[in-house]
Each structure stands twice: as C-alpha cells, then as structure tokens.
Amino acid sequence: MIEPVRVIGGGIAGAEAAWQCARAGVPVVLSEMRPVRPSPAHHTDHLGELVCSNSFGAMATDRAPGLLKEELRRLGSLVIAVADAHAVPAGGALAVDRAVYTRELTERVANHPLIELRREEVTEIPAAGLVVFATGPLTSEPLAHGLQALTGLGYLSFFDAASPIVAGESLDTEKVFLASRYDRGEAAYYNCPMSEPEYRAFWEALASAEQAELKEFEHEERKFFEACLPVEELARRGYETLRYGPLKPVGLTDPRTGRWPFACVQLRQEDRAGRLWNLVGFQTNLKWGEQKRVFQMIPGLEQAEFVRLGVMHRNTFLCSPHLLAPTLQFHAHPRLLACGQLTGTEGYTAAVAGGWLAGTNAARLAQSRDPLVLPVETMAGALVDYVSHGDPKTFQPMPPNFALLPEITPRIRHKQQRYWAYRDRALAAIDTFGRTHGLGAAPALARAN
C-alpha cells in the first residue's frame, strides 16, 4: 500500500500539490489551519484564496506570467483550469470571480476520493513520511520555529525587504560602467555615477516620494524593519546620508572623467547568467509607480526594465538555494519538499508552478520513482532553477520574468521577437517534457457564463 503524502497548507500551492499527488494515484492528507486558526490576511476558509488581487497576471504568452500559465495548462494544472473557468473581463489579464473560483477549487480538492482534507493547525514537523510544505508567506509561528530548527538559524526569513531588480540588457551602457571599489578583484558591479545636480534632483524626489501603506498585521511586527531601513528613510535623514551609505562614491573612478563621481548607485549581479541586476542598498517601501518614476532618474536607468520592484512586507520564505534541490526536495531531508511563496517565488502563478512540481515529485517518490526536474528553457523550470541555484547571500523572492531564461544564441536584438522566441522554445520544451513523462491535460471544466 502506498503511504499518504502530507501536504501542509491549503493555499494555491498546497491545493495544486495535493491535486497532482491524487491525480497520480497517491493518497494525500491536506492540512489547512483555517478556520481552526484564522490568518490575519485571509477572509474565508476556502482553499486557494486569493489574498491580494484577483488577477493571475497577463494572459499573452509573449509575457512571462502568460507563458507560465500556458505551460501549466499543458502540464494539467487544476488551479489554472479553475481560474480559466471563472475568468472575468480584465483586458489582457486572467482575473477571476474570487467567490466562485475558491468555492469550486475547494469542492474539487475536498471531494477527490484520494484527498483527506483536515482542518487543523500543524505545529511540528512530521516525524516521518513524505511531506510537502506549502504554508506560504504567513506561516504560523509554531511551524515557522519548526522549519527554523530543521533548516538552521538564518535560513528562514520573516520579512521581505528587497531592492528592485532590473534587466541588464535595458541599462544604458554609455552611462554606466563596470568596476569594483578601488578596482579590487574583478569588475563585479555596474556603477551609475551622479553629478551634484543629478544627485540633488534624485535626493529631492526620493525624500518626497509616496510610500505604500503597511497592512495592519505588518504594523504590529515593524521591528523586523529596524535592521533594514528603506532607502527613502535614509534620504529623509539628510542630504548627505545617502552619500555615506548606499550611494558612496569612494573608490569608483568614472572612466569618462577619470574622477570619483559626486555619488554613485551600484548594481550587483543577481543571477548566474548576469542578466538580472540588483540596486544595492535600495530596499524600499515606495509605491510601485513612485519607484519607477524616481529610480529611472538614476543615470543609465532611464529606460530600465524593472523585473521586480522593491518591497518591504511580511513574508516567510526559505533561503532556498542553500536548502532545496531543483526537484524542490530538501538536500538534507529528501522526503521533505517545499513549494509556493515559501520557496522564494513571487506571484500566484509561480506558486501554482511550485505546487505542481512538489506534488508531482512527492507522488513519484511515494511510488519509488525518480523525481522530475523541469527544463530550464521553460518559465516554470527557470523559476525553480533560480530558487535552487541562486546566490544564498543575496537571495530574494522573484516573480516570473524572461531574464531568468537561458539566452537564445545568436542573440535576437528586437525585444518582441526575442520574447516570441523564448515562448516558442519554452512551449516546445514543455510539450516534450509532458510527452516524455506521460503528463496529461487538466480536467475539462465548464466555463462560467
């Protein structure tokens, strides 16, 4: 008899993981703490509740979120099938009627003959068996302590204080230059030099920019922000503060002038391929529109493509590159898997992708079969590759974006044509992957009128 897989957490990732296990013929015990223990962000006890927006993002497959959704359709995702069935008009996005979407998702998962839904809070790491952790950004305190004990101190974060990330190909290389401070070691940073007038204009805009409101439960835990001040708060402390902090220019010689600039913003490489660049020291709580307006004032970033904007919010996530394999198994505990936002992906569709892989692999392990690794040419595979192979020292949650994919050679200069090529390669790879491993389509669901 096949042992049941434990899935802890009934959000988007957990619901998908449980369904994929059951679909493979493996029994599942799905534990969801609501309504026994309410969450500060949820409003119902339904599975897969959408806490923030009701949108899964762009539908077009020449956009990263849309490509990821199409890959998941071809892999047989239940969550995406239910979302498609209950879509509401939203321009080019997949938005859903939350009430009917969560109701149908809950009914389908709870009524599956191989899924036992338990309304219970799990406070300890199960001592044995195959377990999928899908507890999300609001993991309960007792279980978070258990994960911390399992993984080691320092490998579980409780707040996401992240700087913006830009696509390297969108930088103006006539203005930025590669160098390390005092030319020590290899030229590892892109540097954006500022004159005094440029710095003054930037400082004034940053100090007066509008911040996002923290949610009520984030106000209660604001102590987590103390060690990681937002860049706009530094600006408000005085005109010179940034020049002695993240914008200090010492040791950075501008090749255009032969001198140190008045101030300098540094960008650090975020991925192995050097296609993603992080604004060093720019953790921020500014509204997203304000971030683009202010940060595009930085010389060289006028046309920057932001693949992730800065955030400061409550978000429990693992240092996945240190802990997880590309199968989403823990290196040190291969019968334990993790998925969703807990692993450091960002966004609803990325959580579904993690749930799909963790559920599929948990089922295969239960059947004594080898777990799967998604092709890195796919958006789903590129996300998992990022969370399992990123730099542990600088790891921050990441949404789907084309800069995660391996470059196509020779490089296609036209941006739209390049995105089409990424899409075509990814969908061909996911189709081959599905055929190779016998992965069928999702259940046919009637579309709501």
From Swiss-Prot:
Keyword terms of this UniProt record: Cytoplasm, FAD, Flavoprotein, Methyltransferase, NAD, NADP, Transferase, tRNA processing
Domain of life of the native organism: Bacteria
EC number per UniProt: 2.1.1.74
Gene3D superfamilies, per database record: FAD/NAD(P)-binding domain (3.50.50.60)
Recorded catalytic activity of this chain's protein: uridine(54) in tRNA + (6R)-5,10-methylene-5,6,7,8-tetrahydrofolate + NADH + H(+) = 5-methyluridine(54) in tRNA + (6S)-5,6,7,8-tetrahydrofolate + NAD(+); uridine(54) in tRNA + (6R)-5,10-methylene-5,6,7,8-tetrahydrofolate + NADPH + H(+) = 5-methyluridine(54) in tRNA + (6S)-5,6,7,8-tetrahydrofolate + NADP(+)
GO biological process, one term: tRNA methylation
Alphabetized Pfam families for the sequence: GIDA
UniProt KW Cytoplasm keyword: yes
GO cellular component terms, A-Z: cytosol
Classification via InterPro entries: FAD/NAD-bd_sf, MnmG-rel, MnmG_N, TrmFO
Chief location: cytoplasm
Sites where the protein binds FAD: G9, G10, G11, I12, A13, G14
Compartments, as annotated in UniProt: Cytoplasm
Keyword Nucleus: no
Necessary cofactors: FAD
GO MF entry, a single one: tRNA (uracil(54)-C5)-methyltransferase activity, 5,10-methylenetetrahydrofolate-dependent
Family the UniProt entry places it in: Belongs to the MnmG family. TrmFO subfamily.
PANTHER family xref list: GLUCOSE INHIBITED DIVISION PROTEIN A, METHYLENETETRAHYDROFOLATE--TRNA-(URACIL-5-)-METHYLTRANSFERASE TRMFO
The protein's role, per its UniProt record: Catalyzes the folate-dependent formation of 5-methyl-uridine at position 54 (M-5-U54) in all tRNAs.
Name listed for the protein in its UniProt record: Methylenetetrahydrofolate--tRNA-(uracil-5-)-methyltransferase TrmFO
